[in-house]
């Protein structure tokens, strides 16, 4: 099947219009939610079994096809954190926080990444935000533990 230039331009325009209106590749390709859930299950299973490279492939796919799903972004961020790619992880955690609104889990993990990036003041800001704004008491306790541990560190 060959497409002429006009057909290619029409398809390109339709895809760009769809993306500009907020559609994801999942939507454009009509991938059902249950299929995405199955792929997520594989990614999560690989992650839990320590098969990080395989998990990364699946989480990358999920993020590319549905960049609005916080679980997919958190999964890929966790992979980067495990692989000690802390700046990439922190960047993805920031996206997850922006999409997730009131869930401060990504902010907590950003704080962990900032510590590993040797930026204790940034880490402190993250942990303080968690304590001030999170509704998750367990997460607040963890954040306070980090704050207590780094209280005397200067950048």
Curated annotation (Swiss-Prot):
Subcellular location: Cytoplasm
This protein's UniProt keywords: Chaperone, Cytoplasm, Plasmid, Virulence
Highest rank taxon of the organism: Bacteria
Classification via Pfam families: TPR_3
Keyword Cytoplasm: yes
GO MF, any single term: identical protein binding
TM region(s), chain numbering: none
Major localization listed first in the record, in broad terms: cytoplasm
GO CC, one annotated term: cytoplasm
UniProt cross-references to InterPro entries, sorted A to Z: T3SS_Ca_resp_chp_LcrH/SycD (IPR005415), T3SS_Ca_resp_chp_LcrH/SycD_sub (IPR016379), TPR-3 (IPR011716), TPR-like_helical_dom_sf (IPR011990)
Xref: NCBIfam families: LcrH_SycD, PRK15331.1
Family affiliation: Belongs to the LcrH/SycD chaperone family.
Its biological purpose: Assists the correct folding of nascent IpaB. Once it is bound to IpaB, it binds to IpaC and impedes their premature association that would lead to their degradation in the absence of IpcG.
Protein name: Chaperone protein IpgC
Organism in which the protein naturally occurs: Shigella flexneri
Gene behind this protein: ipgC
């Amino acid at each position: 099947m060959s497409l002429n230039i006009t057909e290619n331009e029409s398809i390109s325009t339709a895809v760009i219009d769809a993306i500009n209106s907020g559609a994801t590749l999942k939507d454009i390709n009509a991938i059902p939610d249950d299929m995405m859930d199955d792929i997520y299950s594989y990614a999560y299973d690989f992650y839990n079994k320590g098969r990080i490279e395989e998990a990364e492939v699946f989480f990358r796919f999920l993020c590319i096809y549905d960049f609005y799903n916080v679980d997919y972004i958190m999964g890929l961020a966790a992979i980067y954190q495990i692989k000690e790619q802390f700046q990439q992880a922190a960047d993805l955690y920031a996206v997850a926080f922006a999409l997730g609104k009131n869930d401060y889990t990504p902010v907590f993990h950003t704080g962990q990444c900032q510590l590993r990036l040797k930026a204790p003041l940034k880490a402190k800001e993250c942990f303080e935000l968690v304590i001030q704004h999170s509704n998750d008491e367990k997460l607040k306790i963890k954040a306070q533990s980090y704050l207590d541990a780094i209280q005397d560190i200067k950048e």
